[in-house]
Protein backbone atom coordinates (compact mmCIF):
# COMPACT_ATOMS: atom_id res chain seq x y z
CA UNK A 1 0.00 0.00 0.00
CA UNK A 2 1.31 3.47 -0.85
CA UNK A 3 0.55 6.82 0.76
CA UNK A 4 0.92 10.32 -0.75
CA UNK A 5 0.72 13.38 1.51
CA UNK A 6 1.00 16.93 0.13
CA UNK A 7 0.73 20.35 1.78
CA UNK A 8 0.30 23.90 0.49
CA UNK A 9 1.20 27.12 2.27
CA UNK A 10 -1.41 29.21 4.06
CA UNK A 11 -0.27 32.61 5.29
CA UNK A 12 -3.64 33.64 6.74
CA UNK A 13 -4.08 30.68 9.09
CA UNK A 14 -2.74 31.11 12.61
CA UNK A 15 -1.51 27.53 12.77
CA UNK A 16 -1.21 24.42 10.65
CA UNK A 17 -3.59 22.50 12.91
CA UNK A 18 -7.11 22.74 11.61
CA UNK A 19 -10.33 20.88 12.18
CA UNK A 20 -10.95 20.64 8.45
CA UNK A 21 -8.49 19.15 6.03
CA UNK A 22 -9.37 21.13 2.96
CA UNK A 23 -10.40 24.78 3.50
CA UNK A 24 -9.73 27.93 5.55
CA UNK A 25 -12.51 30.57 5.47
CA UNK A 26 -11.71 34.22 5.09
CA UNK A 27 -11.59 36.55 8.06
CA UNK A 28 -14.92 37.76 9.36
CA UNK A 29 -16.80 34.92 7.73
CA UNK A 30 -18.37 31.94 9.40
CA UNK A 31 -19.07 28.72 7.54
CA UNK A 32 -22.32 27.36 8.99
CA UNK A 33 -24.07 26.13 5.84
CA UNK A 34 -23.96 22.31 5.62
CA UNK A 35 -22.47 20.77 2.54
CA UNK A 36 -24.02 17.67 1.03
CA UNK A 37 -22.16 14.76 -0.55
CA UNK A 38 -23.42 15.74 -3.99
CA UNK A 39 -21.42 18.96 -3.93
CA UNK A 40 -17.88 18.99 -5.20
CA UNK A 41 -15.03 18.93 -2.85
CA UNK A 42 -14.36 22.56 -1.91
CA UNK A 43 -11.39 23.86 -3.77
CA UNK A 44 -8.58 25.53 -1.85
CA UNK A 45 -7.34 28.99 -2.62
CA UNK A 46 -3.63 29.70 -3.02
CA UNK A 47 -3.48 31.14 0.53
CA UNK A 48 -5.18 28.28 2.40
CA UNK A 49 -3.46 25.38 4.14
CA UNK A 50 -4.56 22.20 2.45
CA UNK A 51 -3.39 18.66 2.29
CA UNK A 52 -4.40 15.64 0.28
CA UNK A 53 -4.11 12.09 1.61
CA UNK A 54 -4.29 9.31 -0.97
CA UNK A 55 -4.25 5.59 -0.23
CA UNK A 56 -3.35 3.23 -3.10
CA UNK A 57 -4.04 -0.49 -3.18
CA UNK A 58 -7.00 -0.75 -0.87
CA UNK A 59 -9.59 -3.36 -1.75
CA UNK A 60 -12.42 -0.91 -0.95
CA UNK A 61 -13.11 1.97 -3.38
CA UNK A 62 -11.63 5.36 -2.58
CA UNK A 63 -14.05 7.55 -0.70
CA UNK A 64 -14.03 11.31 -0.57
CA UNK A 65 -13.35 12.67 2.93
CA UNK A 66 -16.45 14.26 4.44
CA UNK A 67 -16.60 18.05 4.56
CA UNK A 68 -17.69 19.57 7.82
CA UNK A 69 -18.76 23.12 8.40
CA UNK A 70 -16.27 25.43 10.07
CA UNK A 71 -17.69 27.63 12.76
CA UNK A 72 -16.35 31.13 13.20
CA UNK A 73 -17.30 34.63 14.28
CA UNK A 74 -19.37 35.68 11.34
CA UNK A 75 -22.16 34.06 9.36
CA UNK A 76 -21.14 30.91 7.61
CA UNK A 77 -21.34 30.21 3.92
CA UNK A 78 -19.85 27.74 1.54
CA UNK A 79 -16.61 28.75 0.00
CA UNK A 80 -17.09 28.72 -3.75
CA UNK A 81 -14.36 28.34 -6.34
CA UNK A 82 -13.35 31.66 -7.82
CA UNK A 83 -12.83 30.26 -11.28
CA UNK A 84 -14.32 27.58 -13.49
CA UNK A 85 -10.88 26.36 -14.59
CA UNK A 86 -10.06 25.29 -11.07
CA UNK A 87 -13.34 23.40 -10.93
CA UNK A 88 -12.57 21.52 -14.14
CA UNK A 89 -9.09 20.70 -12.85
CA UNK A 90 -10.56 19.26 -9.67
CA UNK A 91 -12.91 17.05 -11.70
CA UNK A 92 -9.96 15.73 -13.68
CA UNK A 93 -8.06 15.01 -10.46
CA UNK A 94 -11.01 13.04 -9.08
CA UNK A 95 -11.19 11.02 -12.30
CA UNK A 96 -7.45 10.36 -12.10
CA UNK A 97 -7.85 9.14 -8.53
CA UNK A 98 -10.58 6.74 -9.58
CA UNK A 99 -8.49 5.42 -12.46
CA UNK A 100 -5.52 5.03 -10.14
CA UNK A 101 -7.66 3.09 -7.72
CA UNK A 102 -8.88 0.72 -10.45
CA UNK A 103 -5.33 0.20 -11.67
CA UNK A 104 -3.74 -0.47 -8.28
CA UNK A 105 -6.58 -2.51 -6.80
CA UNK A 106 -5.32 -5.79 -5.47
CA UNK A 107 -7.26 -8.75 -6.65
CA UNK A 108 -7.31 -11.90 -4.62
CA UNK A 109 -5.68 -14.75 -6.51
CA UNK A 110 -7.65 -17.91 -6.50
CA UNK A 111 -5.79 -20.84 -4.95
CA UNK A 112 -3.95 -23.00 -7.39
CA UNK A 113 -5.74 -26.16 -8.25
CA UNK A 114 -3.49 -29.12 -7.74
CA UNK A 115 -4.04 -31.54 -10.54
CA UNK A 116 -2.70 -35.03 -10.74
CA UNK A 117 0.14 -35.24 -13.21
CA UNK A 118 -0.26 -38.05 -15.65
CA UNK A 119 3.04 -39.39 -16.92
CA UNK A 120 2.97 -41.48 -20.03
CA UNK A 121 5.85 -43.93 -19.97
CA UNK A 122 6.73 -45.32 -23.33
CA UNK A 123 6.84 -49.07 -23.45
CA UNK A 124 10.43 -50.23 -24.03
CA UNK A 125 11.20 -51.85 -27.34
CA UNK A 126 11.81 -55.62 -27.44
CA UNK A 127 15.33 -55.12 -28.80
CA UNK A 128 16.23 -52.87 -25.87
CA UNK A 129 14.87 -55.40 -23.37
CA UNK A 130 16.82 -58.25 -24.96
CA UNK A 131 20.03 -56.23 -25.03
CA UNK A 132 19.62 -55.28 -21.36
CA UNK A 133 18.93 -58.90 -20.37
CA UNK A 134 22.03 -60.14 -22.22
CA UNK A 135 24.16 -57.42 -20.62
CA UNK A 136 22.96 -58.32 -17.13
CA UNK A 137 23.65 -61.97 -17.89
CA UNK A 138 27.21 -61.39 -19.10
CA UNK A 139 28.06 -59.02 -16.23
CA UNK A 140 26.79 -61.54 -13.66
CA UNK A 141 24.18 -59.20 -12.16
CA UNK A 142 22.21 -62.30 -11.16
CA UNK A 143 24.79 -64.89 -10.14
CA UNK A 144 22.40 -67.82 -10.05
CA UNK A 145 20.96 -67.10 -13.49
CA UNK A 146 24.38 -66.53 -15.08
CA UNK A 147 25.75 -69.72 -13.54
CA UNK A 148 22.81 -71.76 -14.81
CA UNK A 149 23.05 -70.36 -18.33
CA UNK A 150 26.81 -70.90 -18.56
CA UNK A 151 26.54 -74.45 -17.25
CA UNK A 152 23.65 -75.36 -19.54
CA UNK A 153 25.22 -73.94 -22.70
CA UNK A 154 28.61 -75.50 -21.93
CA UNK A 155 27.15 -78.95 -21.31
CA UNK A 156 25.03 -78.71 -24.46
CA UNK A 157 28.04 -77.85 -26.60
CA UNK A 158 30.12 -80.62 -25.06
CA UNK A 159 27.34 -83.10 -25.78
CA UNK A 160 27.06 -81.86 -29.35
CA UNK A 161 30.79 -82.44 -29.81
CA UNK A 162 30.33 -86.13 -28.85
CA UNK A 163 26.79 -87.01 -29.97
CA UNK A 164 24.43 -86.12 -32.78
CA UNK A 165 22.02 -83.21 -32.61
CA UNK A 166 18.96 -85.51 -32.47
CA UNK A 167 20.34 -87.47 -29.54
CA UNK A 168 21.22 -84.32 -27.62
CA UNK A 169 17.74 -82.86 -28.22
CA UNK A 170 15.97 -86.06 -27.12
CA UNK A 171 18.00 -86.56 -23.96
CA UNK A 172 17.68 -82.89 -23.06
CA UNK A 173 13.89 -83.03 -23.31
CA UNK A 174 13.82 -86.17 -21.15
CA UNK A 175 15.90 -84.51 -18.43
CA UNK A 176 13.72 -81.38 -18.38
CA UNK A 177 10.46 -83.37 -18.29
CA UNK A 178 11.71 -85.60 -15.49
CA UNK A 179 12.48 -82.56 -13.32
CA UNK A 180 9.21 -80.72 -13.99
CA UNK A 181 7.03 -83.83 -13.57
CA UNK A 182 8.72 -84.65 -10.27
CA UNK A 183 8.03 -81.18 -8.89
CA UNK A 184 4.44 -81.22 -10.12
CA UNK A 185 3.72 -84.62 -8.54
CA UNK A 186 5.30 -83.46 -5.31
CA UNK A 187 2.96 -80.44 -5.09
CA UNK A 188 -0.03 -82.70 -5.83
CA UNK A 189 1.02 -85.04 -3.04
CA UNK A 190 1.31 -82.16 -0.57
CA UNK A 191 -2.14 -80.97 -1.56
CA UNK A 192 -3.56 -84.46 -1.00
CA UNK A 193 -2.01 -84.50 2.47
CA UNK A 194 -3.48 -81.00 3.10
CA UNK A 195 -0.06 -79.48 3.47
CA UNK A 196 -0.23 -77.24 0.45
CA UNK A 197 -2.59 -75.55 -1.97
CA UNK A 198 -1.55 -77.72 -4.92
CA UNK A 199 -0.68 -74.76 -7.12
CA UNK A 200 1.56 -75.28 -10.10
CA UNK A 201 5.15 -74.29 -9.15
CA UNK A 202 5.66 -73.07 -12.70
CA UNK A 203 2.56 -70.86 -12.79
CA UNK A 204 4.65 -67.69 -13.03
CA UNK A 205 6.28 -68.92 -16.23
CA UNK A 206 2.93 -70.12 -17.57
CA UNK A 207 1.43 -66.65 -17.08
CA UNK A 208 4.29 -64.94 -18.88
CA UNK A 209 3.10 -63.50 -22.18
CA UNK A 210 5.30 -64.80 -24.99
CA UNK A 211 3.05 -63.78 -27.86
CA UNK A 212 4.20 -61.21 -30.36
CA UNK A 213 1.91 -58.56 -31.73
CA UNK A 214 1.58 -58.05 -35.45
CA UNK A 215 3.69 -54.91 -35.31
CA UNK A 216 6.48 -56.62 -33.38
CA UNK A 217 6.48 -59.59 -35.77
CA UNK A 218 6.68 -57.24 -38.75
CA UNK A 219 9.60 -55.38 -37.17
CA UNK A 220 11.51 -58.62 -36.49
CA UNK A 221 10.92 -59.94 -40.01
CA UNK A 222 11.91 -56.61 -41.57
CA UNK A 223 15.09 -56.51 -39.46
CA UNK A 224 15.98 -60.10 -40.42
CA UNK A 225 15.46 -59.42 -44.14
CA UNK A 226 17.50 -56.23 -43.90
CA UNK A 227 20.39 -58.06 -42.21
CA UNK A 228 20.25 -60.90 -44.75
CA UNK A 229 20.22 -58.53 -47.73
CA UNK A 230 23.13 -56.52 -46.29
CA UNK A 231 25.17 -59.70 -45.79
CA UNK A 232 24.49 -60.90 -49.33
CA UNK A 233 25.48 -57.53 -50.80
CA UNK A 234 28.72 -57.50 -48.78
CA UNK A 235 29.66 -61.04 -49.86
CA UNK A 236 28.88 -60.18 -53.48
CA UNK A 237 31.18 -57.15 -53.36
CA UNK A 238 33.95 -59.21 -51.73
CA UNK A 239 33.83 -62.19 -54.08
CA UNK A 240 33.37 -60.12 -57.23
CA UNK A 241 36.25 -57.81 -56.22
CA UNK A 242 34.34 -54.54 -56.17
CA UNK A 243 37.08 -53.07 -53.96
CA UNK A 244 40.52 -54.66 -54.35
CA UNK A 245 41.67 -53.71 -50.84
CA UNK A 246 38.63 -55.24 -49.12
CA UNK A 247 38.87 -58.42 -51.17
CA UNK A 248 42.54 -58.86 -50.23
CA UNK A 249 41.70 -58.46 -46.52
CA UNK A 250 38.97 -61.05 -46.82
CA UNK A 251 41.42 -63.42 -48.54
CA UNK A 252 43.90 -63.14 -45.66
CA UNK A 253 41.18 -63.78 -43.05
CA UNK A 254 39.89 -66.86 -44.86
CA UNK A 255 43.43 -68.21 -45.22
CA UNK A 256 44.00 -67.86 -41.45
CA UNK A 257 40.72 -69.64 -40.74
CA UNK A 258 42.03 -72.71 -42.54
CA UNK A 259 44.68 -73.10 -39.83
CA UNK A 260 42.09 -72.59 -37.10
CA UNK A 261 39.86 -75.25 -38.65
CA UNK A 262 42.75 -77.71 -38.76
CA UNK A 263 43.18 -77.43 -34.96
CA UNK A 264 39.63 -76.82 -33.72
CA UNK A 265 36.23 -77.80 -34.99
CA UNK A 266 33.20 -75.52 -35.00
CA UNK A 267 31.78 -76.74 -31.67
CA UNK A 268 35.09 -76.15 -29.90
CA UNK A 269 35.40 -72.63 -31.28
CA UNK A 270 31.82 -71.89 -30.26
CA UNK A 271 32.51 -73.27 -26.78
CA UNK A 272 35.55 -71.03 -26.40
CA UNK A 273 33.50 -68.03 -27.52
CA UNK A 274 30.82 -68.75 -24.91
CA UNK A 275 33.37 -69.09 -22.11
CA UNK A 276 35.09 -65.89 -23.22
CA UNK A 277 31.78 -64.01 -23.36
CA UNK A 278 31.03 -64.93 -19.75
CA UNK A 279 34.60 -64.27 -18.56
CA UNK A 280 36.14 -61.25 -20.30
CA UNK A 281 33.45 -58.62 -19.51
CA UNK A 282 33.61 -59.18 -15.77
CA UNK A 283 37.43 -59.31 -15.82
CA UNK A 284 37.59 -56.08 -17.80
CA UNK A 285 35.21 -54.42 -15.34
CA UNK A 286 37.39 -55.43 -12.39
CA UNK A 287 40.74 -54.48 -14.00
CA UNK A 288 39.68 -51.73 -16.37
CA UNK A 289 42.56 -49.32 -15.58
CA UNK A 290 45.33 -51.84 -16.18
CA UNK A 291 43.72 -53.23 -19.32
CA UNK A 292 43.27 -49.75 -20.81
CA UNK A 293 46.92 -48.93 -20.04
CA UNK A 294 48.26 -52.01 -21.84
CA UNK A 295 45.87 -51.55 -24.74
CA UNK A 296 47.05 -47.96 -25.21
CA UNK A 297 50.70 -49.12 -25.23
CA UNK A 298 49.99 -51.78 -27.85
CA UNK A 299 48.03 -49.33 -30.01
CA UNK A 300 50.92 -46.83 -29.88
CA UNK A 301 53.39 -49.51 -31.00
CA UNK A 302 51.11 -50.58 -33.84
CA UNK A 303 50.57 -46.99 -34.99
CA UNK A 304 54.32 -46.31 -34.92
CA UNK A 305 55.05 -49.42 -36.97
CA UNK A 306 52.29 -48.56 -39.44
CA UNK A 307 53.52 -45.00 -39.91
CA UNK A 308 57.09 -46.24 -40.41
CA UNK A 309 55.95 -48.81 -42.97
CA UNK A 310 53.86 -46.26 -44.85
CA UNK A 311 56.79 -43.82 -44.90
CA UNK A 312 59.10 -46.47 -46.34
CA UNK A 313 56.55 -47.36 -49.00
CA UNK A 314 56.11 -43.71 -50.06
CA UNK A 315 59.88 -43.07 -50.20
CA UNK A 316 61.04 -42.85 -53.84
CA UNK A 317 63.67 -45.41 -54.94
CA UNK A 318 67.31 -44.30 -55.12
CA UNK A 319 68.66 -43.48 -58.56
CA UNK A 320 71.29 -45.84 -59.95
CA UNK A 321 74.56 -44.23 -60.91
Swiss-Prot record:
GO terms for cellular component: endoplasmic reticulum; endoplasmic reticulum membrane; intermediate filament; membrane; neuron projection; postsynaptic density; sarcoplasmic reticulum membrane; T-tubule. Residues 77-86 have a biased composition (Basic and acidic residues). The gene is rtn2. It holds the Pfam family Reticulon. This is Reticulon-2. The chain crosses the membrane at residues 163-183, 263-283. InterPro entries: Reticulon (IPR003388), RTN1-4 (IPR046964). Keywords: Cell membrane, Cytoplasm, Cytoskeleton, Endoplasmic reticulum, Membrane, Sarcoplasmic reticulum, Transmembrane, Transmembrane helix. It comes from Xenopus laevis.
Amino acid sequence: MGHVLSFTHCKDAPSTASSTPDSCPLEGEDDDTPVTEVDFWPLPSPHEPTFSYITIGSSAPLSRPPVRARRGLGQGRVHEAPREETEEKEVKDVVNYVLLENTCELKQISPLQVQEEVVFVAKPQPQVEVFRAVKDLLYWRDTLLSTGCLTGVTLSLLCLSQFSVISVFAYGCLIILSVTLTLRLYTKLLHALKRGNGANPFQYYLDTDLKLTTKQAEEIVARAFSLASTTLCTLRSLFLVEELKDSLKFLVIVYLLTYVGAVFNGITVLLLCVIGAFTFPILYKQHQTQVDHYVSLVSKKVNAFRSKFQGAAKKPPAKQK
